[in-house]
Amino acid sequence: MEGFKIKSVKARQVFDSRANPTVEVDITLKDGTVGRGIVPSGASTGLFEAVELRDGEETFDGKGVSKAIHHVNEQLAPLLLDMDVRDQKAIDSRLIEIDGTPNKSRLGANAILGCSMAACWAGANYYKVPLYRYLGGSAANKLPVPMVQIIGGGAHADNVIDIQDFLVIPTSAPTFSEGYEMVVNVYNAAKMIFKGAGKPVSIADEGGLWPTGFQSNEEGLKLLCESIELAGYTPGQDLGIALDIASSEFYDPERGTYRLELEKKTLTKEEMVGMLSDWVDNYPIISIEDGMSELDWEGNLLLTQKLGKKIQLIGDDLFTTNIERIRKGVEMKVDNAVLIKMNQIGTITETIETIEFTQNHGYLPVVSARSGETEDCTIVHLAIATNAGQLKVGSAARSERTAKWNEVLRIEEALGSSARYPSKGVFAAAGIQFNQY
């Protein structure tokens, strides 16, 4: 019996953490095995991402996904029937071929990725093994260092503060569970500081605290340091700070300037680099994402020349999980790390290939969720399957975030003594030497 062959493919509309529709796909094999994938969605999206297909009609403010679902059920499903689910690369190649566009704009990356995710889960379930083991084999045992949002700003909090994410990374913990406990303590300490200052504690899209009453972006850095200390840790020794600037959101491509609306400042690229460099000198910052715009290659190069040996510089909107854009970054020596988002490229195979390309060229992969998330935990398994070493899924609150952190805790327990946790050693591959504080 060829139980490993695909018997049916079914897509449906479900909802993400921002109450927007998204695509869920079930793939059933001939032996009855089922795999399921739910597609995430971003708020601040790069210009060069694979195209997420939305209906553009009155329902759901134009964000319906009935067209993408129709494409799965009517166009993709018939051509996936009887395929061997064990051959993920062949399935993804067929999905790409059926769409026929370089950015998956005809059928929608959300339609294609849903099928790709469901197929890999069906394959893992067919063999009755965890997804990280199915995709990564016996060598998949490196647990990711968590990058956890404490304050959510930018597009995740109605732009009440310009910087999108203020995060912490545990650097002294010997295990994932101990590292995650540290960031939870910092998160709760930050809430206490907000309450003590009489500020309402609201929650941003990814579970971080809503930055109420800030007069400057730098206040977020000061609050993180205070929170780390209140939790009983030493900033720069036990935990470092990470920032997602998401600078494309406030970049003016015509003038080549950056507008910090909170402070009513307009900065040249040189001034923007100078501001970030000053922050790195004055605070225990060990990672900056999208410090300069996706359209500002010159600015990104200036930032890398200034900070590339001191801290991790992550390209998200700049690279969009796309090997050709990462190749350009490698050739120009821009950044030293790549944010990995499945829906930016659109299939599991392409995502894994991008991670491998990143690692092979001395850059650090950081597997990431989106602001519109669900209970789906594929990215956790993907991070461990590829030994990526870092995971960014939002904060320590909201169940679509904790679902993923909890999945890492379960995998850590399952791996037992074979689990490897790199702690701050994860940054060594990029030749980063952190400042001492």
UniProtKB/Swiss-Prot annotation:
What Enzyme Commission number does this protein have? Answer: 4.2.1.11
Tell me, what is an example of a GO biological process annotation in this record? glycolytic process
Write out the residues that bind Mg(2+).
D244, E289, D316
UniProt KW Protease keyword: no
The enzyme's first-digit EC class, named in words, is: lyase
Provide the reaction this enzyme catalyses.
(2R)-2-phosphoglycerate = phosphoenolpyruvate + H2O
Give the metabolic or biological pathway.
Carbohydrate degradation; glycolysis; pyruvate from D-glyceraldehyde 3-phosphate: step 4/5
Please give the cofactor(s) recorded in the UniProt entry for this protein.
Answer: Mg(2+)
Reading the lineage from the top rank, the first entry is: Bacteria
Q: Name one GO molecular function term.
A: magnesium ion binding
Co-factor note (free text): Binds a second Mg(2+) ion via substrate during catalysis.
Keyword Magnesium in record: yes
Query: Where, subcellularly, is it found?
Result: Cytoplasm; Secreted; Cell surface
Q: Which residues bind (2R)-2-phosphoglycerate?
A: Q164, K341, R370, S371, K392
Q: Which CDD domains match?
A: enolase
Q: Which GO terms describe its cellular component?
A: cell surface; extracellular region; phosphopyruvate hydratase complex
Gene3D superfamilies attached here?
A: Enolase-like C-terminal domain, Enolase-like, N-terminal domain
Name the active site residues: E206 (proton donor), K341 (proton acceptor)
**Quick one: where is this thing mainly located?**
cytoplasm
Which keywords does UniProt give here? Cytoplasm, Glycolysis, Lyase, Magnesium, Metal-binding, Secreted
PROSITE patterns this protein is in?
ENOLASE (PS00164)
Biological role stated in the UniProt entry: Catalyzes the reversible conversion of 2-phosphoglycerate (2-PG) into phosphoenolpyruvate (PEP). It is essential for the degradation of carbohydrates via glycolysis.
The similarity comment for this entry is: Belongs to the enolase family.
| Name of protein | Enolase 1
Organism of this sequence = Desulfitobacterium hafniense (strain Y51)
